[in-house]
Amino acid sequence: MTTPHTVRIWDLPTRIFHWTLALSVIALVITAKVGGNAMEWHFRLGHLVLALLVFRIVWGLIGGRWSRFAAFVYAPARLVRYLRGTPHPDDSVGHSPLGALSVFALLAVLVAQVGTGLLSDDEIAFAGPLTRFVSNAVVGQATGYHKEIGQYLVLGLVALHVLAVLFYVLVRKQRLVRPMLHGDKALAGPVDASRDDMLTRTVALVVLALSLGLAWWVSSLAAAAF
């Protein structure tokens, strides 16, 4: 019987990002549906998600081994092999080829949703901080996408992501949730671990601080208009 190798796959910054983003998206949906004064929190959460997305893009370039985009950018042939049931051994380590598509799609849709949110105006009490830099036509288009298209794309991809996780956990008996909590995976063979030491976490804090600073600066542009 082969002894499983316990390997650190998801570094702490990636795990914190994942769960913070998940909770933030849930809160954004709730505040959007409630409306009224809850929209103040909707805007704050939107800026938090902006910071998280900036952080993840940077971390996808310099983060842990399996958190980097290079670790889950797959060639089409690799995806076809995975769908045919003949996956590469590394496909079960970090994000699988299908999981990678889900990650990139969700990041892209969230970037579009946050971007259009910054340009949106509800014509009542709340307007994004970048509305003063563009024409009314652009504001109208951004608002329309944000309310009528983007939110449903986000909800659809989140639902698809949850269903996929449930399928892999319940049907394929793969533990996907626990590694995103404690970072480690039990694998059949040795693989390179993600670096997750104090230096890595310190760098992540610096990146996060800069990302939060950028989001705060963007939010301050609204106040500068008055």
Each model region followed by its residue ranges:
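Membrane-embedded alpha-helical bundles that constitute the cytochrome b-like, heme-associated redox core
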Residues: 1-226
